[in-house]
Amino acid sequence: MRMTTRRGSGRRRAVPRWLMAALALATLAGCGVSTVDEVRVAWPPFKDGTALVLPSDPAQCPDLSGTYRVAGEPRAGEAAAGVGDLRRFLAYTLDLPGLPDTAEHAWRPTPAASVTFNAAPQGWQVVADDGQGGRFTGLLPLRDATAGVDRPADGPLAALPGVQHFGGCTQGRFWISARRDWRQYESMGVFRTVALLRPQAGGLLVSVQRESHSIGLLPWYSSDEVRSQYWFGPERASR
């Protein structure tokens, strides 16, 4: 995109490159407010690395314990492969440690594949079973369950380099946010995700909003937003 401005003489003149960059950075610093599963989400400016954190109260935590089918049923928003598969969502959209494939251990799902949530002192232990002996274990953490852990309260979880996680409970929902920053040559950007999980009709309802922003030196700026909601039925219903 090429921006132009007019001088008093009426001649068109290209806007200086530095001004284009400043305009792009101003856009990049923007923030907004959205609603995800009836919960207000205030997105902070992301250029300065601020994490997305919602209010949290342990008394408002839902019980996510249960075993759920891997394949979800769309309920609202856009279809998204990264959300409609529960194990893929946890492993790659949220980048939870312990759940992605490794060189020694690959996910080979069968129709019996499932994901189990078990209550744990620090949140919910997640066990993904591909139905033929392959098991991956991770943790959906409670933000308030950081006592005794060598990190600041409300701090990000140990995860992949460049990935931040925060989690907690509000309005009967468990929320988790993930932020991944990237840089390549003269370009930089960020992926941000917030997800709210709650039990519904014996299954698990997952509501997600994802944002991506990138900026380069042309200068150019791009952004994208996807909202999805999927319901994952109880594993027993598939038998």
Segments from the language model and where they lie:
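Sec-dependent bacterial lipoprotein signal peptides
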Residues: 1-31
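Amphipathic/hydrophobic helical signal segments and adjacent flexible N-terminal regions
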Residues: 31-121, 177-179, 200-239
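Predominantly extracellular/secreted and cell-surface proteins with exposed
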Residues: 105-184
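Phosphate/adenylate-binding glycine loop and adjacent helical scaffold
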Residues: 188-195
